[in-house]
From Swiss-Prot:
Its cofactor is Zn(2+). InterPro entries: Helicase_ATP-bd, Helicase_C-like, P-loop_NTPase, SEC_C_motif, SecA, SecA_CS, SecA_DEAD, SecA_motor_DEAD. Monomer and homodimer. Part of the essential Sec protein translocation apparatus which comprises SecA, SecYEG and auxiliary proteins SecDF-YajC and YidC. One of its GO terms (cellular component) is cytosol. Residues 863-874 have a biased composition (Polar residues). The gene is secA. This is Protein translocase subunit SecA. Residues 843-852 have a biased composition (Low complexity). The lineage of its organism: Bacteria, Pseudomonadati, Pseudomonadota, Gammaproteobacteria, Pasteurellales.
Length: 905
C-alpha cells in the first residue's frame, strides 16, 4: 500500500527512465528536418563520419542522436518505414545492457536496426539472436537493404553452412544467427587445432530477440558437442590375444636385479608396466601382426597409441576381475561400484579400459561417446561485452534478468493504446465440459467471421482438441514446431475472416497476425505481379480486414493456464496489436495440470461439489487472482532452481574460461618453448620432491625410487647412487639442478636433430592434444561429482561449498597431470630424423581432423537433418582433385574431408 502511494507521487523507476528518454527523443526529432534535406550520398557518408569520430575518441552515446536520426531517415527512404517515437525509445533502451518489453506488433524488428547500427560502428561486430533459422533469415533479408545503404555488411549464420561461408558471416558488421548455432560455434572454436580454423571474433554486442525464451526458458539447456572415441575395435581384439603370452614378474627391474618376466603390477594404483624384456616381446608380436614395422619401437612417435592399448589390455586381464569389478549382463560389461557392490548401468571406464575388458570378455566392443565441450546459454551469453534483449513479455521475469544477467527491464509504451478485451477465466468441472464450451465459443466466432487463435499447453492437447473440432465439422489449421517457415506462414494467415488456428503456446512467435490475412504474402507468391494484380489483392484484403474489424478482431482462446504468467501473456499478446480490436479468454477445468498440482484433493473435491449442473461454468475475478498467485509461486520456485543450478555451473564456467584462455594462447603463440622449460622444471622438481624431500638429510632420501621414477616417467637412466658415492659435495640442490640440466640437454639434443621449427610445432601439438584429452575427462569427472554432491548434506556439509572445494582440487590435479603428461611425452620421444617427428605431427593433425568431423551436436531443439552421402567405396572410385569440393556434400575441400581420410587410411 505504502509503495503504491510513493509510486503515485514520484512515479516508478520505469516511468522515470521513460521521462528521461523522451527528452532524448525530442533531440532526435529536432535533427529530422536537416537530415531530410541530405542527399543519399551525404546520408550514406554519415557512417564513415561516425566511425572516424569514434576513432578520434568520441563515445557511442555522444553519437546516438545523430546515428538514430540517420537510421530513421535511411529507413524512410529505403524501406518506406519511419521509426515511431516509441521505437526510438526502444532503440535507446537496447543500446545498453537492458531488456525492452515491447508488445506484439510494435515493430521490434525495425526497432532493432537502431542499436544494431550504432554498435556496429565500432567495427567489433553485432550478433542479432533469434530462436530459429527462419526468423534469422527473414529479419536479415528485411533489414539488409537498410544496412547496406548505410555501408554496413549483413550476414546470416545458420547450421549447415560451409566453414568458409560461416567464417565470412562472423566477419560481417551485423550477423543474424540462432542462439544454438552461436553457442555451438563458440565450442567448435575452442576445439580448433589452428587459429585460422576458428569462426568467431571477440563477443562484443548481442541483441537477443524473444529474450525470455532464450535466457529464461532455455537457460539450462546445455549445448553439448560429443565425439565418439576412435573406432579401434580390431586393434583391441588383436592386442587382447597378446596378453596370454606375457609372464608376470614379481618386481621391477633395477641395476641389481633383472627378472625373467614381461610385466609388473602395481596393485595399489591398479597400474601395469612392461619390463624391457616384455617390451621387446610385445614389439615382436605386433610386428608379426603387421601393426608395426620392422625395427620400430613402442616409443616411436607413430606407435605411442599402440602402447596405450597394450597397457589397457594388461590392466583388463590382470587387474580387473569378472564378478568383482564388473559383470557381463545382456552382452554388456557393467561396472560394479566398489563401495556399494551395486551395478552402475551406463557408466564406462575411460582410457580404453572398458573396451579392453569388452575384448577380454568377447562381447561387442562399444565406441566411447564422450562430451568434449559444453556450455549453457546462461554462461554463453554472459560472455558478451554488451548484452540486450527484446520481447513482448519480460516484466514478470524482471527480477531474474537483473539477478542473473545484470539486465534492467524497461516496459516500452505502445504507439497506440491497447483496446483488447481480456475477459475473466471460465472454470469447468472436467476437461470434456471445457472442450465443449471452447467449441461453442469457436462456432459463435465463426458465425460472425471472427478469426480465432486457440493456444494449448502441449502438442498432445493440440491433437486432442483438433480431433474434437474435426468431429464438430470445424475447418482449422494445427501448428507444430517442426517446420518454422510453414508455421510462420500459417500464423500470418490466422487473421483471415473465420479462420481457426490451434497452436501450442510458443508456436509462431516472431510473426505478426495481420487482421484480414497477410496481403504481402499473397503478392510474394506471384511471379512479376502487375500493378493491377497488386491493387486487386490489396482491395480484397481491405474487404476482409473490415469484416474482421467489425467482428471484433482476433479472438484468443487459452485452453489452460501455463505455470508461467509470461507464457499466458504471450498468447494474449497475439491479439490487439497496434490499437486493433481483439479479445481473449482462458478456459480452465479441475483436470488441468496446474489445478491438480497446486490444489490438494480435499479442495478439488470441494470445488467439484460447487458445480451443480453439467457444463456449468464458474466465473470469478477472485479465481483469476488465486491462479495468478499460484503462478507467481511457481515462477519464484523455478527461479530459485535456476539460480541454484547456476551457482554450480559457475564453478565449471570459471574453469572453462581458464582452459579456453590457455588454449587460445597456445593457438596464437608460435613459440611455447619458454612455457615448456618452466613446466619441465615444475614437473621434475615435483617428482624429485617425492623421493628427496626439500631441506632433508641424505638418510631420508629414496635414491632407488627416484632412479626408477625418472626411468619410468621420462626414460632417463641416471646413476644417481653412483654420483652420491663418488662426489661428497653433491647435496640436494646441486643434485636437483644436475637432473634438470641433463633432461634439458637431452631435449635440446633432440631439437638439434629435427630443427627448432619442427620441435616448436610438435610441442604445441602435444600440449593441445593432452589439454583436450584431460579436459574431456575432467568434464566427465565434474559431472559425476555434481550428481552425487547433494549427499554431503546428510553429513551436515554445504553441498555447494563441498562442490567448489573438490572441483578446485580436481582442476589443479588435472593441470598437474597435464604438465606431467606433456613433459613425459616430450622426454620419452625418440627421434632419429626430421621425417619421424613430422610423421608424428601428421598423425596428430589427422586425429584432430577426424575428431572435428565426428563431433556431434546434441541439442533438444535441433531437428534431424538427413542427407544422402556417398560410400567410401564410391568416393575411392571418383577422380577428384585435392582442391575440389568433396562430393560427400560437406562443403569442405576434398583434401580436408574424405581425401584426408584416404591419406591416413
Amino acid at each position: 500500500m505504502i509503495s503504491k502511494i510513493i509510486t503515485s507521487i514520484f512515479g516508478s523507476s520505469n516511468d522515470r527512465t521513460l521521462k528521461r528518454l523522451r527528452k532524448r527523443v525530442a533531440q532526435i526529432n529536432k535533427l529530422e528536418p536537416a537530415f531530410e534535406k541530405l542527399t543519399d550520398e551525404e546520408l550514406q557518408a554519415k557512417t564513415a563520419e561516425f566511425k572516424q569520430r569514434l576513432a578520434d575518441g568520441a563515445s557511442l552515446d555522444s553519437l546516438l542522436h545523430e546515428a538514430f536520426a540517420t537510421v530513421r531517415e535511411a529507413s524512410r527512404r529505403v524501406m518506406g518505414m519511419r521509426h515511431f517515437d516509441v521505437q526510438l525509445i526502444g532503440g535507446m533502451v537496447l543500446t545498453n545492457r537492458n531488456i525492452a518489453e515491447m508488445r506484439t506488433g510494435e515493430g521490434k524488428t525495425l526497432t532493432a536496426t537502431l542499436p544494431c547500427y550504432l554498435n556496429a560502428l565500432t567495427g567489433k561486430g553485432v550478433h542479432v539472436v533469434t530462436v530459429n533459422d527462419y526468423l534469422a533469415r527473414r529479419d536479415a533479408e528485411t533489414n539488409r537493404p537498410l544496412f547496406e545503404f548505410l555501408g554496413l555488411s549483413v550476414a546470416v549464420n545458420v547450421p549447415g553452412l560451409p566453414n568458409e561461408v560461416k567464417r565470412e558471416a562472423y566477419k560481417a558488421d551485423i550477423t543474424y544467427s540462432t542462439n544454438s548455432e552461436l553457442g555451438f560455434d563458440y565450442l567448435r572454436d575452442n576445439l580448433a587445432h589452428a587459429k585460422e580454423d576458428r569462426f568467431q571474433r571477440e563477443l562484443h554486442y548481442a541483441l537477443v530477440d524473444e529474450v525470455d525464451s532464450i535466457l529464461i526458458d532455455e537457460a539450462r539447456t546445455p549445448l553439448i558437442i560429443s565425439g565418439p572415441a576412435e573406432d579401434a575395435t580390431q586393434i583391441y581384439q588383436a592386442i587382447d590375444t597378446i596378453i596370454p603370452h606375457l609372464v608376470q614378474q614379481d618386481k621391477e627391474d633395477t641395476e641389481e636385479y633383472t627378472g625373467e618376466g614381461d610385466f609388473t603390477l602395481d596393485l595399489k594404483n591398479k597400474q601395469a608396466h612392461l619390463t624391457e624384456r616384455g617390451m621387446v616381446k610385445v614389439e615382436g608380436i605386433l610386428t608379426e601382426m603387421g601393426l608395426m614395422q620392422e625395427g620400430e619401437t613402442l616409443y616411436h612417435p607413430a606407435r605411442i597409441a599402440l602402447l596405450h592399448h597394450v597397457y589397457a589390455a594388461l590392466r583388463a586381464h590382470k587387474l580387473f576381475e569378472l564378478n568383482v569389478d564388473y559383470i557381463v549382463k545382456d552382452g554388456e560389461v557393467v561396472i560394479i561400484d566398489e563401495h556399494t557392490g551395486r551395478t552402475m548401468a551406463g557408466r564406462r571406464w575411460s582410457d580404453g579400459l572398458h573396451q579392453a575388458i569388452e575384448a577380454k570378455e568377447k562381447v561387442n566392443i562399444q565406441g566411447e561417446n564422450q562430451t568434449v565441450a559444453s556450455i549453457t546459454y546462461q554462461n554463453y551469453f554472459r560472455l558478451y561485452e554488451k548484452l540486450a534483449g527484446m520481447t513482448g513479455t519480460a516484466d514478470t521475469e524482471a527480477f531474474e534478468f537483473q539477478q542473473i544477467y545484470g539486465l534492467d527491464t524497461i516496459v516500452i509504451p505502445t504507439n497506440k493504446p491497447v483496446i483488447r478485451d481480456d475477459r475473466t477465466d471460465l472454470m469447468f468441472k472436467s476437461e470434456p465440459e471445457k472442450f465443449a464450451a471452447i467449441i461453442k465459443d469457436i462456432q459463435e466466432c465463426m458465425a460472425r467471421q471472427q478469426p480465432v487463435l486457440v493456444g494449448t499447453a502441449s502438442v498432445e492437447k493440440s491433437e486432442l482438441l483438433s480431433a474434437e473440432l474435426t468431429k464438430a465439422g470445424i475447418a482449422h489449421n494445427v501448428l507444430n514446431a517442426k517446420f518454422h517457415a510453414q508455421e510462420a506462414e500459417i500464423v500470418a494467415e490466422a487473421g483471415a475472416p473465420g479462420a481457426v488456428t490451434i497452436a501450442t503456446n510458443m508456436a509462431g512467435r516472431g510473426t505478426d497476425i495481420v487482421l484480414g490475412g497477410n496481403w504481402k504474402a499473397e503478392i510474394a507468391k506471384l511471379e512479376n505481379p502487375t500493378e493491377e494484380q497488386i491493387e486487386a489483392i490489396k482491395a480484397a484484403w481491405k474487404e476482409r480486414y473490415d469484416i474482421v474489424m467489425k467482428a471484433g478482431g482476433l479472438h484468443i482462446i487459452g485452453t489452460e493456464r501455463h505455470e508461467s504468467r509470461r507464457i499466458d501473456n504471450q498468447l494474449r499478446g497475439r491479439s490487439g496489436r497496434q490499437g486493433d480490436p481483439g479479445s481473449s479468454r482462458f478456459y480452465l477445468s479441475l483436470d488441468d495440470a496446474l489445478m491438480r498440482i497446486y490444489l490438494n484433493e480435499g479442495k478439488l473435491n470441494m470445488m467439484r461439489k460447487a458445480f451443480s449442473e453439467e457444463g456449468e461454468a464458474m466465473e470469478s475475478k477472485l479465481l483469476t487472482k488465486v491462479i495468478a498467485s499460484a503462478q507467481a509461486k511457481v515462477e519464484a520456485h523455478n527461479f530459485d532452481g535456476r539460480k541454484n543450478l547456476l551457482q554450480y555451473d559457475d564453478v565449471a564456467n570459471e574453469q572453462r574460461k581458464a582452459i579456453y584462455e590457455q588454449r587460445n594462447y597456445l593457438l596464437e603463440t608460435e613459440d611455447i618453448s619458454a612455457m615448456i622449460e618452466t613446466i619441465r622444471g615444475d614437473v621434475f622438481n615435483r617428482v624429485i620432491d617425492q623421493f628427496i624431500p626439500p631441506q632433508s638429510i641424505e638418510e631420508m632420501w629414496d635414491v632407488a625410487g627416484l632412479e626408477e621414477a625418472l626411468k619410468r616417467q621420462f626414460g632417463m637412466e641416471l646413476p644417481i647412487q653412483h654420483w652420491l658415492e663418488q662426489e661428497n659435495d653433491l647435496h640436494e640442490e646441486t643434485l636437483r639442478e644436475r637432473i634438470i640440466d641433463i633432461a634439458t640437454q637431452e631435449y635440446h639434443a633432440k631439437e638439434e636433430k629435427v630443427g627448432s621449427e619442427v620441435m616448436r610445432n610438435f610441442e604445441k601439438g602435444v600440449m593441445l592434444q593432452n589439454l583436450d584429452e584431460l579436459w574431456k575427462e575432467h568434464l566427465s569427472a565434474m559431472d559425476y561429482l555434481r550428481k552425487g554432491i547433494h549427499l554431503r548434506g546428510y553429513a551436515q556439509k554445504d553441498p555447494k561449498q563441498e562442490y567448489k572445494k573438490e572441483s578446485f582440487e580436481m582442476f589443479t590435479n588435472m593441470l598437474d597431470l597435464l604438465k606431467s603428461n606433456v613433459i613425459s611425452v616430450l622426454s620419452r620421444i625418440q627421434v632419429r630424423s626430421q621425417e619421424e617427428i613430422e610423421e608424428a605431427q601428421r598423425q596428430q593433425e589427422a586425429m584432430a581432423q577426424a575428431e572435428s568431423e565426428n563431433y556431434r551436436t546434441a541439442d533438444h531443439q535441433a531437428e534431424a537433418q538427413q542427407s544422402e552421402s556417398l560410400t567410401e567405396e564410391q568416393l575411392a572410385n571418383l577422380d577428384i582433385g585435392r582442391n575440389d569440393p568433396c562430393p560427400c556434400g560437406s562443403g569442405k575441400k576434398y583434401k580436408h574431408c574424405h581425401g584426408s581420410k584416404a591419406r591416413y587410411a
